Every structure is written in C-alpha cells, then in structure tokens.
Design a protein with these regions (language model features):
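Amphipathic heptad-repeat alpha-helical coiled-coil/stalk segments that mediate oligomerization
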Residues: 198-206, 262, 273-275, 366-445, ...
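Active-site phosphate-binding and catalytic loops of NTP-dependent enzymes
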Residues: 109-118, 245, 382-385, 444-456, ...
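Charged, surface-exposed helical/loop "interaction arms" that form contiguous linear patches used
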Residues: 353, 357, 367-370, 388, ...
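Charged catalytic and DNA/RNA-contacting regions of genome-maintenance
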Residues: 1-323, 336-339, 343-352, 356-448, ...
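Short hinge/gating elements
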Residues: 51-63, 212-223, 274, 284-288, ...
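Amphipathic alpha-helical
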Residues: 85-102, 544-552, 559, 726
Length: 860
C-alpha cells in the first residue's frame, strides 16, 4: 500500500467528505487541487497542471495564490462545479507539525454570495423539485436576497416555473433522477439528494425550526404538502454546504397559480420574453427594461414571468405609471434617487451571512440616505398606490447615522487593513492611533523636555530587543543624570538609562498596533450586530424600491416609445388599434415606420381570425404583437398601440415556428402536435391562442386536415377561446362560410409584374396566393431555380383547375357532415364501427387528430 505524506493523508480525509465537490486546499499562500480536481481546475481556469510526489505516488497538482480566490472561484462555479473551500484553521507559525484544516464554505452554482459569481440584474435561484403521485412541488431560494418561494401543481406548471425562474442549481431526490429527466430534460445543473431529505416530518421540523414557529400556517403554505418537502430539502442543502447564517430568510411565500397568467414553456420561448442561451436575438425584456436599480431589474423579470390576472392590481400599476407621466418633475426626482441606489437587497443579506465588508456597509448607508426623499415624494403624490408605498418605506435614519459615525467614508474592503472606524467614534481607538502615528514626535518631545530638565545637550533615545526604549548619555555628562533615571547598561563611552515615562510609553506603543486591529474588529462586529436589527426593514425597502423602479421604468418606456394606457375590463374582448410589435419596431432602420395593425377578437362574433398571406408578409409578427400587448398590459405597462381595450386574459398559448427535438427523439411534426395538444387540453374562456402554420410539418392534405380539425375544435369548444390562426393553407378560408365566429383576414401584398411588395397591413378577406416563388427570389435563389419553379407552378395550377383544392376540401367537409354514415359501403361501415368504439372521454386532441388522419387515408 502506498505511503501517504501527512499532508495528503489530511487532504484525502477531507476530500472523502466532499466527493462531489472540487476541493480547494489551502497550503501556505496557495489554494491547491490534486488528482482529478487538478485536471478539472487546470482545464477550466487555464492554469498549469503539474505532478508532485505524495509519498510513494505521483499526483496531478494545480493551484493559484490564495488572494486570487475571487478571480478563480467564479469561473469554477459558472462552469457548474460545486467548490469546497478548505482553509487553515490555525496560524502555521504557532503550530508544530501539520496545520489543522477544514472546509469553511461550499460554494455551488445555486448557493453563492460572491459578487463576481452573481449577476446584479438576475436572481440566482437554488431550486428543488419533488414529483409526487397527486401533484408536484417546487421551491426556489435566492440566498443572496433571502427570497424563498414555493409552488405546487402538475408537471406542466412546474416546467413553466423552471423555464421562468431559470435556477442555477436544482435539487432532486436520487430515485427520481430518471423521471425528472424524462419530463424536464437535462439542461439543469442537478444535485441528487438522499430520499429521506424529502420526508414530511423532516421538512416540517427543519422549516419550523428555522422560522421559529409551531407551524407553517402563518405563511399560507401549510396545505402545499409536496412543496413543503422541497423547501425542507433546500434548507438541508444550505446546512450541508456550510451556510448557517440565514437570518435574512425571514419568510416563505406561495406562488399562487390562480393569481397569474398561464404562460407555458413554449409561449415563453416563442414570444422571446427573455434572451436565449444560444441565440443573440433581442428579447422583450431587453426592450422594456428601463429600470435603474438591481432590485428593479430583478423585479421586472419576476413581473414578466408572472403577469397579473386581478383587474384592480393591474389598474393600480397603470395609475402609478399615469401619475408619473403627468408629473414628469416627480418622475425625474425619483429616477435620480433610484440611479444612486446600490443593491441594498444583497448588501443586507451579506450582513446576515457575515460576508459584508466595511466598504459595502458604506455603500449600504449611501443607498439608504436616498430613501427619505423617495418616501417624501411618494407620500406627497396624491396617488393611492404611491402613498401606500411611501407609507411602507422605512427611512432607516438611525441606521444611516450609526453607520456614518462608525465607519470612515473611505473604509477599506478588508477590515484588517485598518482605518475602517471613523475618527472620533472611539476615544480609546483615537488614542492608540495617536500613539502609533505620532510615536516619533512624542519621543522628540520627551527628549527635548529631559534635555532641558537635566542640562544635557546630547541625549539620544533608541531601543533594542533586550530592554526596549532607553536614553543614552555620553560619559562626559553622566554626572548630570537625575536620580529618577534607572541605569540599564554601561558602554565604553556612554551609559543607557530608562525612565518611568519611557517605560509607560513603550508599553503603550508596542501593543498599540495589535490593540488597534482588535478594537477595530470588535467595533465593526458591534456595528454589524446593530445593522442586523434592521434586516427586515431594509428587505422591505428593497422590495418596494424594486416595484417603484419598475413603474418608473414603464413611464420612461411609454414616453420614449409612444406607448398608451390600455383600458382593462372584466369583459372578454380584445380590441387593439394601431398595435405594434415592441421588439421589431426597435430593430427597424432609422426613419422606417412600423406598419401598425388593428386586431379585434371576442367570443360572440369574431372568435377566430384566420390570417392568410405569403411568408415574410408579417403574419407571425401580428400574432406575437397581440400577445405581447396583452402581456405588457397585465404586468402593468402601457402598450405599443394607439389604444387598447382588453378583457383580462388568463392563459396565453402559442404554437409558433418549427423545430426538431432530436434529443427526445421527436420530429418537427411531433413537436408541433405535442404543443397543439397542450393547448387544446388546457384552453379556458379567457385564453388567447396563437397558432402559426399548423400542419406544415406533414403532407399538404394531412396538414390541411389537421389545421381544419383544430380550428373547428376551437370554434366548437364551450370555452370559445379567442384565437389568431395564421396559415398558408388558403383552403381554410372556406371555414368562414360554415363557422359563424371564424373570420378571414389577410396580410396585404401589392403584386407587380416581377415582384411583390409586402404592405404588412391586416385587411378583411382571405388570400388566394402564397407568393412562395417571389420569396425564394428575394432570398437570392439562383435564376434557374426560379424559372423552373414558375414552370412547375403553372403546370400544377393547370392540372388542378378542374377541381380546385379548396373545392375538394369544401365538398369533403359537406359530405362528412351530411352523408358519412348513409352510404352502403363496407369501408365506411368499418370506419363507422371504429368511430363508435372510440372512448372520446379518454381520447386526447392529438390522438383524435391522428385517428381522423388515419380514417381519411383509408377513405382515399
């Protein structure tokens, strides 16, 4: 067996406790990594990988200076590693043999307080998911802000939350690893915990102990049994990662599914609400984020993820935006104050976790000093919501004053550097500093006094390691030495003496530096303890400042982009005049106007708008802008339209674009059908449905059949969900003749001899041409291909002129409705039996569509 060195024996013992983490092992002035950890660290950090002898074995080694930890740690964490930081727990100078070491912190992607790891505009959520038999639970904690949220629902709802909150790390029970991956994919940094962590008795115990309560009823989450399991798992994980200072986590909040608009993961992706991980496209958030503080940016992301359904709350936000637009002077004053606010939410969390440094405390004070003005402006506003917000704001004037009198304005980052405590705060500290800083002048003064008293002109003060400070007198003057001097040493030409005053000064000055450091540490610790009493107040301020910042941002957005206030109501209709796409209009070349469009939808007369028109004509933009206008209105923003009267929408569904899901073994068409099925299974009477090019992933007749069936299903469904249905199947225009609430519209095109001009205007009536070859020409297709395509198109049109496709579809629909079971045909008889044997109560819409498609093939 290989013999280990004492150091490697200690390393291996510690590493065995953290097998899943990359261990940074402090050795002198370096953090070292060994073995596989060294290989990973060298690759990720681009540092040198070497080998060293560890007893009789050789091992890989890679390291970096300890003072560079804040440079290298973020790179490891962002690469997805859990990093255990092992420090020296003793002073090597005072220890014989091996220094005691231990892990002082375990930093993971979801549990980080380092500013270089965190993004100021985004939360850093640690999430946990439990897949129960009846429901699923989820919890989200941002340890850097103290926000703790729980939710419970089906897998689709949990999936939606994961897409919106984008956790940096996800905790899952080991036995649910496979099931989780099947439902939610493998795009998350997952860590797998033992199953017992997700037990009810443990979760209840750890949560009530943390919040110091007898139950969770006061938080309104006691009935969310599955969600409570995940919240308990998160607190367990924090304990395991050496995060014990958690007094800033003061509450646990329920994400009330019924209070917010349903946005499934497809809708979030299709509407491009957030910037993609791979594509550099401009997102809605990029365009609408006019916030000035980190709290505002994070709040806006939350609002976008959770649009409101309560009419009164939506109107309250609109009222505040309206007030600011009518009182620009107040808006500018508030914005100026907001722009000078630091991240008080994360700073106060650092107080709780004892991670805050003196300079950050000064930043906290500087931010808090703007609160009284904001409070005053809100209280004087005469706007009910702003007045209430101002009333809830805490001035924290005592806190600001205490920080100001305790800390120097230019306090260092590291308390050990000294001069953090302000002059005049502590008389003892000032005296010690005086001794330390004015030692030479004191000795010069002492020398002058003693020389005058004794009449000895050539006195000299010096010191050595034997008896410290002394006065040296040449032999020619030793007869003048006073009686109170004590002789300590005789030299050839001189004698050395000490005095009472000199020994007293020596005692003071020798201990001054050490005492200064200890006293500054002690006074700083007292200040942090004082600030800790204000954690709740500062957290409340952070929440309110985030909300206020969002509303100021909405006002700025409306001014800059000509947005108008939507009129919200309890009805069902959507009426938009001159609506615009908020993102596309910002991407147009300077001077190019955006072509605005009107959209009207209701449940009585115009439930489904069938939009036809060529590719590139703007069909998809009209669909998306309608949803985005509704979404913006329900988060409290004004909208890019001349006017908008909007009934509350509770769900927004989109089936837009085409993409394969190769990793899950699904084709474009299968992805399309899955998304369509999700929509049809979840529509409500307040849903807004956007369908773009349904059926294009399969053959023409299959596609038309499925698109027709879906449109008919939506029309006949009791919910009468409002729908925008964009298609290049012009045959679907026939539906308006048979279904009273389906109306045809087209995106107008001006056709010339050799080309087409896309007018991008939505007009009544269907379109009979797709102009696909014109689009191919605009894309730069070779002339040969264009000419060949035109010839083929002409031949195909001639061959189909006898019975146009639209007529075939129309007649087929009539036949299916009127005489399907009247014909004495064995095939139809068999189909009839198949139909009657189907259990429509258990059949999903997609299965129904597939069955319908199969029957049509058998007929043809």
């Amino acid at each position: 067996m290989a013999k280990e060195t004492p150091l490697m024996k200690q390393y291996n013992q510690i590493k065995s406790k953290y097998p899943d983490a990359l261990l940074l092992f402090r050795v002198g002035d370096f953090y070292e990594t060994f073995g596989e950890d060294a290989v990973k660290a060298a690759h990720t950090l681009d540092i040198v990988l070497t080998n060293r002898n560890n007893g009789t074995e050789r091992s890989e080694l890679a390291g970096f200076p300890y003072h560079s930890i804040n440079t290298y740690l973020p790179k490891l964490v962002k690469a997805g590693y859990r990093v255990a930081i092992c420090d020296q727990l003793e002073d090597p100078k005072l220890v014989k043999g091996i220094v005691k070491r231990g892990v002082t912190e375990l930093v993971t992607p979801g549990v980080a307080l380092n500013d270089d790891i965190l993004q100021s505009k985004s939360n850093n959520f640690l999430a946990s998911v439990w897949l129960g038999k009846q429901a699923c639970g989820a919890a989200f904690l941002d340890v850097s802000t103290g926000e703790f949220l729980v939710a419970q629902g089906d897998k689709t709802y949990i999936d939606k939350l994961l897409q919106n909150f984008r956790p940096s790390e996800l905790l899952v029970a080991k036995h649910q690893k496979k099931e989780f991956a099947e439902h939610f994919g493998d795009d998350f940094h997952c860590f797998y915990l033992e199953d017992w962590v997700f037990k009810d008795y443990y979760a209840q115990q750890v949560l009530t102990k943390h919040f110091q309560t007898n139950s969770l009823k006061g938080f309104g989450v006691d009935e969310l049994t599955e969600a409570i399991l995940t919240a308990g798992a998160i607190l367990y994980y924090l304990s395991e990662t050496q995060h014990h200072q958690l007094q800033h986590i003061t509450a646990i909040q329920r994400i009330a599914e019924e209070a917010y608009v349903w946005l499934d993961k497809f809708t979030i992706r299709n509407l491009e609400l957030y910037a993609g991980n791979t594509t550099p496209s401009v997102s809605l958030l990029d365009v609408i984020d006019k916030t000035l503080s980190p709290m505002g940016s994070r709040t806006l992301k939350r609002w976008l993820a959770l649009p409101l359904k309560k009419l009164d709350k939506i109107r309250q936000r609109h009222e505040v935006v309206d007030y600011f637009l009518k009182h620009i002077d107040v808006l500018e004053q508030v914005k100026t104050a907001l722009s000078r606010m630091g991240d008080i939410e994360r700073l106060i969390s650092k107080v709780a976790t004892l991670k805050i440094n003196p300079r950050e405390v000064v930043q906290l004070r500087a931010s808090l000093e703007h609160i009284p003005l904001i409070k005053q402006l809100c209280l004087a506003s005469a706007n009910e919501s702003l007045t209430l917000l101002g009333d809830k704001l805490h001035s924290c004037e005592q806190l600001s004053a205490r920080i100001a009198e305790t800390l120097s304005e230019d306090a260092p980052v590291n308390i050990a550097k000294g001069n953090a405590i302000a002059k005049g705060f502590s008389a003892e500290l000032d005296e010690l500093r005086g001794l330390s800083h004015s030692g030479k002048s004191y000795l010069d003064d002492l020398l002058l006094r003693e020389s005058q008293r004794t009449g000895i002109p050539s006195l000299k003060i010096d010191s050595n390691n034997v008896f410290g400070y002394y006065i040296e007198v040449r032999n020619t003057h030793k007869d003048k030495v006073p009686a109170d001097w004590i002789r300590k040493q005789t030299l050839v030409n001189a004698e050395r003496y000490i005095t009472g005053e000199l020994k007293e000064y020596e005692a003071k000055i020798l201990g001054a530096e050490e005492k200064i450091a200890q006293l500054e540490q002690s006074l700083y610790a007292e200040l942090i303890a004082f600030i800790s009493e204000y954690i709740g107040q500062v957290q409340t301020n952070a929440t309110l400042i985030g909300q206020l910042d969002c509303l100021c941002g909405f006002a700025t957005l409306a001014m800059e982009n000509n947005y108008h206030r939507p009129e919200m109501n309890e009805g069902y209709a959507i009426e938009i005049k001159d609506g615009r796409h908020p993102v596309i209009e910002k991407q147009l070349p300077v001077g190019t106007p955006y072509i605005a469009n009107d959209v009207y939808l209701d449940r009585e007369r115009q439930q489904i708008i069938m939009i036809t028109g060529p590719n590139m004509s703007g069909k998809s933009a009209i669909l998306r802008q309608t949803a985005l206008i509704v979404l913006l209105a329900q988060i409290g923003s004004f909208v890019p339209a001349a006017s908008a009267q909007l009934g509350i929408v509770d769900k927004i569904f989109t089936r837009v674009g085409a993409s394969d899901n190769i990793s899950m073994g699904e084709s474009t068409f299968m992805v399309e059908m899955n998304e369509a099925a999700l929509i049809l299974n979840n529509i409500s009477d307040r849903s807004l449905v956007l369908l773009d090019e349904i059926g294009r992933g399969t053959s023409t007749y299959d596609g038309i059949s499925i698109a027709w069936a879906i449109a008919e299903y939506l029309h006949e469904h009791p919910s009468k969900a409002k729908t925008l249905f964009a298609t290049h199947y012009h045959e679907l225009n026939e539906m308006s003749e048979q279904f009273e609430r389906i109306k045809n519209y087209n995106v107008s095109v001006k056709e010339t001899k050799d080309s087409v001009l896309f007018l991008r205007k939505l007009t009544e009536g269907g379109s009979a041409h797709s102009f696909g070859i014109h689009v191919a020409k605009m894309a730069g297709m070779p002339q040969y291909v264009i000419q060949k395509a035109n010839k083929m198109l002409k031949k195909l049109e001639e061959s189909h002129n006898v019975v146009p496709t639209a007529e075939v579809v129309k007649n087929a629909q009539k036949e299916m409705q009127l005489s399907f079971f009247d014909m004495n045909d064995p095939l139809l008889e068999a189909l009839k039996e198949d139909l009657l044997s189907l259990d429509i109560n258990t059949l999903t819409p997609v299965e129904a569509l597939m069955k319908l498609n199969e029957m049509r093939k058998r007929i043809s």
